[in-house]
């Protein structure tokens, strides 16, 4: 699920998923409005051009990487999400609904310094340009698992078809993967 903390698929560790991403989406990347601080690669020439993280305005831990990415984009650099790489962020609290006072203050600072930041992030989330790459990895994962895949194409009229397919999927849970259209 996009923008959520997700458990690893059964039978897959980070190394196995990373290999699958590398095989499925080699060399692919999409532009993003911001990086994710726990896992960012910054070129030295970009750092020299844009400057260091603004610890004065943000402190350490919240918002400084977002500010850096916004400054980099304004200076003509690209922020890229590599689609051939998988990194797991375990134990983070970034996905929790409630934000700490430090996180809230960092967001206010970002809004003040980069008024278009939230709009750009929400537009990126709405378009989700990495979705097809994730779906391709999911298909590759299913193929690799050897588990049968069932696609049920259903009509939207009344009757017992939907119920029957739901019962069948429940009965075969663990033995087959069901998708419905």
What label would you give each PLM region?
Residues 1-51, 59, 66, 75, ...:
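Acidic/His-rich active-site region of diverse nucleotide-sugar glycosyltransferases
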Residues 57, 86, 156-158:
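Short, glycine/serine-rich, charged loops/turns that create anion-binding
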Residues 59-62, 162:
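Short-chain dehydrogenase/reductase
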Residues 66-73, 166, 170:
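Short, hydrophobic alpha-helix immediately C-terminal to the catalytic nucleophile
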Residues 109-120:
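Negatively charged linear elements and acidic catalytic determinants
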Residues 120-136:
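Short linear, low-complexity motifs centered on an aromatic residue
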Residues 135-181:
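N-terminal subdomain of nucleotide-sugar transferases
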């Amino acid at each position: 699920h996009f923008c959520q903390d997700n458990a690893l698929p059964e039978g897959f560790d980070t190394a196995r998923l990373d290999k699958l991403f590398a095989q499925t989406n080699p060399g692919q990347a999409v532009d993003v409005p911001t990086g994710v601080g726990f896992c960012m690669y910054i070129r030295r020439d970009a750092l020299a051009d844009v400057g260091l993280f603004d610890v004065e305005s943000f402190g350490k831990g919240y918002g400084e990487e977002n500010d850096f990415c916004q400054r980099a984009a304004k200076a003509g650099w690209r922020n890229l999400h590599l689609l051939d790489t998988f990194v797991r962020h375990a134990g983070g609290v970034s996905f929790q609904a409630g934000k700490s006072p430090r996180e809230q203050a960092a967001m206010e600072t970002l809004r003040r310094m980069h008024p278009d930041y939230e709009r750009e992030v929400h537009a990126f989330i709405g378009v989700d340009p990495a979705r097809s790459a994730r779906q391709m990895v999911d298909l590759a994962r299913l193929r690799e698992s050897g588990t049968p895949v069932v696609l049920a194409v259903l009509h939207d009229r009344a009757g017992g078809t939907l119920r029957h397919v739901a019962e069948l999927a429940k009965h075969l849970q663990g033995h087959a993967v069901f998708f419905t259209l």
